[in-house]
Amino acid sequence: MSDKINLMNLTRQQMRAFFQELGEKPFRADQLVKWIYHFGEDNFDHMTNINKKLREKLKTVAEIKAPEIAVEQRSADGTIKWAMQVGDQQVETVYIPETDRATLCVSSQVGCALACTFCSTAQQGFNRNLTVSEIIGQVWRASKIIGNFGVTGVRPITNVVMMGMGEPLLNVANVVPAMEIMLDDFAYGLSKRRVTLSTSGVVPALDKLSEMIDVALAISLHAPNDELRNEIVPINKKYNIKMLMESVNRYLNVSNANHGKVTIEYVMLDHINDGTEHAHQLAEVLKNTPCKINLIPWNPFPDAPYAKSSNTRIDRFQKTLMEYGFTVILRKTRGDDIDAACGQLAGDVIDRTKRTAQKKRFGKEIGTHQIY
């Protein structure tokens, strides 16, 4: 393992401090960040506005290292899924091009501890948190492949969603700095409305998030009552729907990124959570929370105990919610032919603990609020 500092682990402010420690002017950090993220450069020799002496010094103490591509799969609909190598394991990153945008779905952990029953990632177990460089490096690597680095007015990626493998709010220490780089005008310069963090509801971390960063928020709700959510989203046993929605409203009260509305994500599981009675219950849960609702057709994975809701049931569910005045969008399934659709990401995870032991550890950490 290299003892050089990976500059992708540093925000621009941290990099300014790094250059000061080297006896250099802090503005060198601004130059370097622009080279790395705006131009996609990882070779110090190519950074022509930095003097040769400093470039040689940097080569002895620092490196610029992003995850490498292990496997690439391309869908018939244009979606691309990459398995990215992080140490001896792999996480998955998905690029979703559309007419007016290009979205990158980024992973935050190797595996996931939350054990949501309808999600393929959760079945892999949990290994570790990704570092800042492994998170922002997914964006860098994808941008490098897609191209258009440094082309004025052209962005290879217009939106980033923290909706890949893992629970972002259980890795705040690395997710937040990575998102800061996404927002930094010297790096990717994305609008805070174009960077979305999706969470299953780690309430203490969500309450602290607004003190650290302002980005768009999506809530993986998936059930309209505690009894059902306890079964399919087990973190609900610790932080129930009432606690979660109160935390969401607190975040919305101080956030500018969300236009006053949160996105509610709701996977459609046949005869599990897709009945008309569930729609009425969901409307009651959300009546005091400004939101838009994304209905997500469930995407199958091996040995899963669920079936996808029929179009008839989805349509009835959607119309019931719309009668209450909610904005309800049916998410178009993308990349399902390469297992890149929502809930299908798996990667290559070495589960460090058996699932029951992991759940006990997870519950202890959450109980003491040691969340990052």
UniProtKB/Swiss-Prot annotation:
Cofactors required: [4Fe-4S] cluster
Domain Radical SAM core residues, every copy: 98-337
Molecular functions per Gene Ontology: 4 iron, 4 sulfur cluster binding; metal ion binding; rRNA (adenine(2503)-C2-)-methyltransferase activity; rRNA binding; tRNA (adenine(37)-C2)-methyltransferase activity; tRNA binding
Gene that specifies this protein: rlmN
Organism: Histophilus somni (strain 2336) (Haemophilus somnus)
Xref: InterPro entries: Aldolase_TIM (IPR013785), Methyltransferase_A (IPR040072), RlmN_N (IPR048641), RNA_MTrfase_RlmN (IPR027492), rRNA_lsu_MTrfase_RlmN/Cfr (IPR004383), rSAM (IPR007197)
Top-level taxonomic group: Bacteria
EC nos: 2.1.1.192
Pfam families: Radical_SAM, RlmN_N
Active site per database record: 92, 342
Gene Ontology terms: biological process: rRNA base methylation; tRNA methylation
Cellular component GO terms, alphabetical: cytoplasm
Entries under CDD domains matching the protein: Radical_SAM (cd01335)
Protein name per UniProt: Dual-specificity RNA methyltransferase RlmN
Reaction equations catalysed: adenosine(2503) in 23S rRNA + 2 reduced [2Fe-2S]-[ferredoxin] + 2 S-adenosyl-L-methionine = 2-methyladenosine(2503) in 23S rRNA + 5'-deoxyadenosine + L-methionine + 2 oxidized [2Fe-2S]-[ferredoxin] + S-adenosyl-L-homocysteine; adenosine(37) in tRNA + 2 reduced [2Fe-2S]-[ferredoxin] + 2 S-adenosyl-L-methionine = 2-methyladenosine(37) in tRNA + 5'-deoxyadenosine + L-methionine + 2 oxidized [2Fe-2S]-[ferredoxin] + S-adenosyl-L-homocysteine
Compartments, record wording: Cytoplasm
Record's keyword terms, sorted: 4Fe-4S, Cytoplasm, Disulfide bond, Iron, Iron-sulfur, Metal-binding, Methyltransferase, rRNA processing, S-adenosyl-L-methionine, Transferase, tRNA processing
